[in-house]
């Protein structure tokens, strides 16, 4: 077993391994930020609960503002400079949160940090796709989730220790990790944008630039429908991360350190089970996977609506982790398979925008519902997840069937790539 793993890592492309490292760093930073930011805002910063979601929205809003303009920039200037600049920029933004005071300044820092983050995750996925064959994309995207989740174990665990001193100090740890990742990328990553691209795949010189060129969802109807259902599914699922810290804290179930430990446990499940779950369900259809993820999320919401007790909190985050194991690798695999090689970063940026909407709308809507009634997010989330999971499965199924020729005809690639999940 150990020899097999060592052989795999030796044979793996270095850019893909660096991509996994950056996912780990980003996961660490997110894991340190997300569980503790609401607690820091409501206790140390004196921000009303109803406004916490708006600050989360500033971070995601920066991504949404920047993505239409620079989302596909890695297709034009290269992957390496984009990854270096974005990782250092996000890290510097997290470090700045340690020093800032006041709602307005915090909102500005989060907005700028979100702008830098708008190209980080999609470009990492693009680098991995550049240097690995399509048949291996599901495995590598699963490994990316494992790497991110490993960071999300250490992030909340480190944050739980730092929270004993000061909630603000978790930002310092998260920012430092991303800056280190950017420095490693600077010295170790080579350019990958020309790998695996045929001569005919280059973009025409006179092709339009701007919004329609960078956001192919406006031209590829299959991608647009797919991303719509992703947003609906992920918005409701995001309420677990955004609302549980407040829900558990107000009920007296968990301290800030306990919240960090809970999310570290959820990430540990992904690290330990993601590859196993992927192998177990590889013969299942995409529709089966999305419905299974929807049922797991609905059951988690039902548990939370019943009680904020510790067993239900553990059960809920466990079920949501399983749901993400089912659909997490499937979505980037389908999006990447739709993308022509010359537009790979742009398609990934469009997918990232869907996630950004989740990060913006999820906390905003979830905390607003929580301000009205503590159990309202869970009650409202059950029918929303049911509809979204059915729609997402149908959208992926339609994407696998040829409908009309699209740029560079990516349909055969989509069929073969998503077939790994059938």
Which residues does each PLM region occupy?
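Residue-level signature of mid-helix packing/kink "hotspots" within the transmembrane helices
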Residues: 60-68, 152-153, 267-275, 359-360
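A late C-terminal transmembrane helix in Major Facilitator Superfamily
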Residues: 343-371
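Core transmembrane helices of Major Facilitator Superfamily
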Residues: 30, 112-124, 320-331
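Helix-to-loop junctions at the C-terminal end of transmembrane segments
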Residues: 66-78, 273-286, 370
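Cytoplasmic helix-loop-helix junction between adjacent transmembrane helices
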Residues: 110-150
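Structural signature of the two symmetry-related core transmembrane helices
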Residues: 81-95, 288-302
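Juxtamembrane intracellular "pre-TM" segments in multi-pass secondary transporters
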Residues: 1-13, 191-227, 415-421
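Short amphipathic helix-loop junctions that connect adjacent transmembrane helices
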Residues: 36-50, 242-258
């Amino acid at each position: 077993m150990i020899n097999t793993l060592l052989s795999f890592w030796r044979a793996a492309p270095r850019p893909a391994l660096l991509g996994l490292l950056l996912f780990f760093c980003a996961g660490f930073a997110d894991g340190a930020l997300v569980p503790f930011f609401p607690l820091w805002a409501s206790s140390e910063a004196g921000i009303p609960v109803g406004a916490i979601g708006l600050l989360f929205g500033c971070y995601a809003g920066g991504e949404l503002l920047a993505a239409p303009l620079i989302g596909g920039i890695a297709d034009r200037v290269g992957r390496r400079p984009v990854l270096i600049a974005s990782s250092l920029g996000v890290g510097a933004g997290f470090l700045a949160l340690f020093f800032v005071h006041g709602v307005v300044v915090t909102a500005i820092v989060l907005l700028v940090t979100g702008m830098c983050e708008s190209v980080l995750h999609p470009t990492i996925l693009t680098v991995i796709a550049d240097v690995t064959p399509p048949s291996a994309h599901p495995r590598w995207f699963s490994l990316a989730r494992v790497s991110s989740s490993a960071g999300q174990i250490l992030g909340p665990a480190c944050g739980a220790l730092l929270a004993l001193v000061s909630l603000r100090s978790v930002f310092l740890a998260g920012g430092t990790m991303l800056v280190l990742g950017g420095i490693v990328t600077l010295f170790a990553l080579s350019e990958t944008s020309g790998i695996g691209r045929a001569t005919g795949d280059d973009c025409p010189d006179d092709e339009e630039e701007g919004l329609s060129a960078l956001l192919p969802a406006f031209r590829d109807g299959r991608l647009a429908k797919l991303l719509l259902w992703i947003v609906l599914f992920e918005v409701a699922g995001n309420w677990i991360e955004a609302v549980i810290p407040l829900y558990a804290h107000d009920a007296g179930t968990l301290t800030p350190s306990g919240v960090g430990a809970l999310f570290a446990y959820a990430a540990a499940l992904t690290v330990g089970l993601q590859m196993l779950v992927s192998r177990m369900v590889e013969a299942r259809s995409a529709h089966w996977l999305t419905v299974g993820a929807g049922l797991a999320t609905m059951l988690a919401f039902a548990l939370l609506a019943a009680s904020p007790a510790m067993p239900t909190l553990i059960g809920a985050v466990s079920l949501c982790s399983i749901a993400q194991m089912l659909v997490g690798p499937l979505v980037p695999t389908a999006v990447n398979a739709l993308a022509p090689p010359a537009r790979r970063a742009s398609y990934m940026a469009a997918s990232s925008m869907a996630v950004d909407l989740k990060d913006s709308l999820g906390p905003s809507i979830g905390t607003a519902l929580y301000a009205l009634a503590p159990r309202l997010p869970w009650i409202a989330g059950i029918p929303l997840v049911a509809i979204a999971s059915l729609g997402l499965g149908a959208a992926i199924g339609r994407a696998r069937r040829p409908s009309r020729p699209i740029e560079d005809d990516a349909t055969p690639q989509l069929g073969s790539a998503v077939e790994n999940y059938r």
